[in-house]
Amino acid sequence: MTEITERIVPPPRKVAGVKESSAEKMARIPIKIIPMPAMRKPEWIRMKVPDSARFREIKQVLRENNLHTVCEEASCPNIGECFSGGTATFMILGDICTRRCPFCDVSHGKPLPPDANEPENLGRTIAQMRLKYVVITSVDRDDLRDGGAQHFVDCIAAVRAHSPQIKVEILVPDFRGRLDRAIHILKAAPPDVMNHNLETVPRLYKEARPGSDYQNSLDLLKEFGKLHPEVPTKSGLMLGLGETDEEILDVMRDLRAHNVTMLTLGQYLQPSPHHLPVKRFVTPQRFAEFERQALAMGFTHAACGPMVRSSYHADHQAQQAGVNF
C-alpha cells in the first residue's frame, strides 16, 4: 500500500534536457505518495526475463540511431517478449515528458526541441528491421504549439517512404488545448490505427492523470474518427488503481458512444515505491469477462488480460479488427 494525501507544490525551476525520475519526479505532484509495503504479486503476474540475441540486437540498433522505445522508458513488463519477437513501440519527441503522471515511469522535465533528423532515422531503422507493423507514440509535449502533431505526421511519412507496405499505428497524447489544430494536422498522414489511452476512470483523473481531461480524450477519439471513418480508433485502461468494475464498464460504454472500436485492458503494476500503489490485482477470469462484455457492446476487438498493454501484439489486434496487411 501507499498513503496518498493532497498538498500544494511550488513551481519547479527546470533546465532543458534534465530528467526527473521516480522520487524526484513525484516530489512536485499535487498528490503526496508515501511508500509503504507493496501487495504481493499473484501467480498469474509473470514476466519473461529479457535475454536473447534478438533483444540485444534491437537495443543496439535503437542506440545507434538515437531512438527511444516506450518499452524501455516506461519499464514495460513485456519488453523481453516483444524485443525477442522483433517488435517495438517507438517513442518520438524525446524521452522527457512535460507531465508527471504518478503511474508512469517515463521521466519528467523540460524537453529539448524536437530532433529534425528523427523522422528519417526512424524510417531508416524500421526498414532495416524489416517490420510489417509499427507503433509510434510520444511523450506529452505541452511546450509545443501543436503538441507534437506535425512531428507525428513527419514520422509517419518517413516510415511509409522507406517501407511502402507497412501499417502504422500511432498512440498519441491528448494534445491538451490543441485538439482541433492537432487533428487538422494529422489529416496530412492519417495512420492505419489511431490510439489514445484513457488510462483510468474519470473519478481517478485528478490522482492518476493530473493535467488531463477525460472528456477531452473522448473528444479526440471521436473527432478523429469523424474525419477518418476508415481508420479504427482504439483506447486502453489500466486496472488496479482503485476503480470499480462498474466504473470500468461505464468507461467502455463511453468509448462506444464515441465510436471507438478497439479496446485494451491490462493490470497496473507499480514501477517503484514512489509511484501510485496497486489497489487490487484483477483475476484472469475477470479480464476474460470484461473482454466478453466489450465484444457484446460492439467493440470489433478487445484484448483484456493481466499482462496486456496498449501496444502488446498490436499487429494481431489490428488484424482482428480488420486492418489488412
Curated annotation (Swiss-Prot):
Residues covered by the Radical SAM core domain: 83-300
UniProt binding sites for [4Fe-4S] cluster 2: C97, C101, C104
Cofactor section: [4Fe-4S] cluster
Cofactor binding comment, as recorded: Binds 2 [4Fe-4S] clusters per subunit. One cluster is coordinated with 3 cysteines and an exchangeable S-adenosyl-L-methionine.
GO CC terms: cytoplasm
Similarity-based family: Belongs to the radical SAM superfamily. Lipoyl synthase family.
Binding site for [4Fe-4S] cluster 1: C71, C76, C82, S311
Pathway linked to the protein: Protein modification; protein lipoylation via endogenous pathway; protein N(6)-(lipoyl)lysine from octanoyl-[acyl-carrier-protein]: step 2/2
Protein name listed in UniProt: Lipoyl synthase
Catalytic activity: [[Fe-S] cluster scaffold protein carrying a second [4Fe-4S](2+) cluster] + N(6)-octanoyl-L-lysyl-[protein] + 2 oxidized [2Fe-2S]-[ferredoxin] + 2 S-adenosyl-L-methionine + 4 H(+) = [[Fe-S] cluster scaffold protein] + N(6)-[(R)-dihydrolipoyl]-L-lysyl-[protein] + 4 Fe(3+) + 2 hydrogen sulfide + 2 5'-deoxyadenosine + 2 L-methionine + 2 reduced [2Fe-2S]-[ferredoxin]
EC number(s) on file: 2.8.1.8
Cellular localisation: Cytoplasm
Record GO terms (molecular function): 4 iron, 4 sulfur cluster binding; lipoate synthase activity; metal ion binding
Keywords: 4Fe-4S, Cytoplasm, Iron, Iron-sulfur, Metal-binding, S-adenosyl-L-methionine, Transferase
